[in-house]
Curated annotation (Swiss-Prot):
S-S bridge residues: none
Protein name: 4-diphosphocytidyl-2-C-methyl-D-erythritol kinase
EC numbers: 2.7.1.148
Keywords linked to the UniProt accession: ATP-binding, Isoprene biosynthesis, Kinase, Nucleotide-binding, Transferase
Amino acid sequence: MTSAATTSDVVHARAPGKINVSLTVGALQEDGYHDVATAYQAVGLYEDVWATKADGFSVEFGGSIDTSHLTTGADNLAVRAARLLARSTGYRGGVHLRIEKNVPIAGGMGGGSADAAATLLACDTLWGTERTRDQLLALGAELGADVPFALAGGTAIGTGRGDRLSPALAKGTFQWVLAIAEFGVSTPDVYGELDKHRERHAQDIFPAQQIPQVDSGVLQALRAGDPHMLAEVLHNDLQAPALHLAPGLGEVLQLGEENGALAGIVSGSGPTVAFLAADLDSALELQIALSAARLTVIRATGPVHGARIITG
């Protein structure tokens, strides 16, 4: 994450999407939320934001995916990010945002959070508000649990709501093949289904942890840079409820593993399915096989850096 004051009229910032290689969800809290423990990995699918000074706050979308159903009003997360930065710094102007989206929408990969992260960085540079890294991370946490990680990038452990970050060592590059669904899944619906599942099976499963933790095997696999080790410990507590709400994802998981994936996992709350491949050649072969099965497929590598200024 890099930021500096500028005299440019336009600032271009970029932030990555993410995969949760491990996601453990704690018990339902009184406020209706859950604490989590997750291992994030930033992957090379990017959201690009161009920020231009303006009197008010506005946003428009473009890019490789259909954005026609996205809101461009005050409730858009990128607009909220810009307004939050202006309010917290006393900046009296506005901004027009142009966002090119390449991270699947409502796919569990943090595309909206990447928009917000890139917007914070772009506006901080455009306006010369000169927030520190920690200040930007704190603002990001006000916007959503995944925003701080989109700012930080790399590989990290997220606790609390996922916004309290600790860097994690990760050696080498992991090869991912992403099967993109033609539909979205509501994150609140997936968490709600998880709570119902736990209530229905309270006699048969261990109680949810009050303070969830990432399994040590995940950290060891990341440190080793070994995709075979990581494949053995991929974990997502939200996968079962996501499969319940979207049963077709189970067929996608099976298809990927039948065509050479080391393992597959629903990314976050879904419905994107992330397959881990042994190496680049295996990833290419898997991409071809899934494409032949008429799935929309993207290949990506991780970890990659977090939000940064491209020009400005």
